[in-house]
């Protein structure tokens, strides 16, 4: 596909600046296409339980059902993978890890952000489309109100 060029003209008809728009190519990315109370859609597949999603890797089940259960061993696998930013979807609500877990994750020396699972799904796509090496650990299922915002 050929790039599109947009030109902004001043009142005199002269070109003031130019911006080249290129079609987005996201074929190689595993993007979160939809999320609802009972599942998340990644590509053509649906996931109804918590999962880990990392660059160049198929999603795998994550054995965490709620944030209050989370501990250091739950991050062992994902910390061995290659990524720059990890988004941890904490379920229906935004939670922060306890001090012990914060210290362990800080030693990993990479960006780790905690947010609601709904926010993590949306943020994952934005970062992936921006070319960032992003991973996500998403706790499911969500209540219907967490998805709709009501």
Segments and roles (model prediction):
Residues 78-115:
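Mid-chain, well-packed structural core segment of small domains
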Residues 117-122:
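Short acidic loop-to-helix transition motifs that present clustered carboxylates
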Residues 123-129:
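Conserved phosphate-binding catalytic cores of ATP/NTP-utilizing and phosphoryl-transfer enzymes
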Residues 60-62, 94-97, 123:
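Short active-site-adjacent helix-start/loop capping segments
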Residues 2-73, 81, 129-150:
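Non-catalytic interface/targeting segments
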């Amino acid at each position: 596909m050929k790039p599109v060029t947009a030109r902004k003209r001043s009142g005199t008809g002269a070109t003031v600046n130019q911006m080249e728009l290129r079609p987005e190519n996201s074929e190689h990315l595993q993007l979160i296409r939809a999320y609802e109370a009972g599942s998340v859609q990644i590509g053509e597949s649906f996931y109804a339980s918590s999962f880990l999603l990392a660059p160049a890797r198929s999603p795998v089940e994550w054995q965490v059902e709620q944030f209050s259960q989370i501990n250091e061993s739950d991050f062992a696998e994902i910390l061995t993978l290659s990524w720059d930013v990890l988004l941890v979807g904490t379920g229906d609500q935004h939670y922060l890890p306890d001090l012990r877990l914060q210290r362990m994750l800080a030693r990993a020396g990479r960006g780790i952000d905690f947010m609601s699972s709904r926010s993590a799904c949306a943020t994952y796509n934005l970062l992936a489309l921006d070319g960032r090496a992003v991973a996500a650990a998403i706790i499911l299922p969500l209540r219907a109100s967490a998805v709709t915002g009501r």
